[in-house]
Amino acid sequence: MFSVYTNDRIADAETDAISDPEKAAFVQRYEHLLEPIADVAYGLAVMIAIAGGPLALFLTFFPGVFWIFYASGWLDAFDGSLSRLKAVLVLNTTVVALAWAIVLTFLPVAFAGASLSPVVLFVFAYFFLRVFTFVELSNIPDTEGDRQIGVSTIPTVFGIRGTRHALYLLNGLTGAIVLGALQSGLTPLPVAGVLLLGTGYSLGVAALVGRWANISVLIQAAEGEYVLTYLALLATMLVV
């Protein structure tokens, strides 16, 4: 993911200069270092994946393939009317969330040699919704730049208030699938409690969208959900 996102930032450095000039300037200044580092990182990931077998190797290539369709203009070489998936409302975030959720869920399954199960599908749905939520929150600072380059996101189309309500909905859906998994016995109560705690934290961050002036701080706070959830899960495993 580091490799894919680094290459994405390099490819979009010019357009990112509109919404985040400091980040774009950093990427352009150190592109000669970032690009080979990203390539080496992907190469290492492929080498590690070989040990996990064909499925793990396939899943490792997944993010790179998704990036080609998501961020590059590669498809335009075949049909000039085709837009980058990155420019299509909801579909752009769906592609990112799918790429993350597929790798985070199924790569460990491939290494463990486990089979597909309802628990795995629950984990996939959970990761998909969490990534989708974070990506749309992260799109808020890019609103002006995205509008200028024709990229449609929830913030550009529905505004801050609409985005806040969308984040409420996404967090609500996450809570619903966690409760559903708990009720059906797919996850024990302590784990469900931790996941709901993280979702509640995210809901609190969403409530501040449009009401807290520094959106960068909110995004950093949203990233804290993963740390909070991980530490709480670790503590739960040590205690229970």
Predicted regions and their residues:
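Multi-pass alpha-helical membrane architecture of UbiA-family
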Residues: 1-240
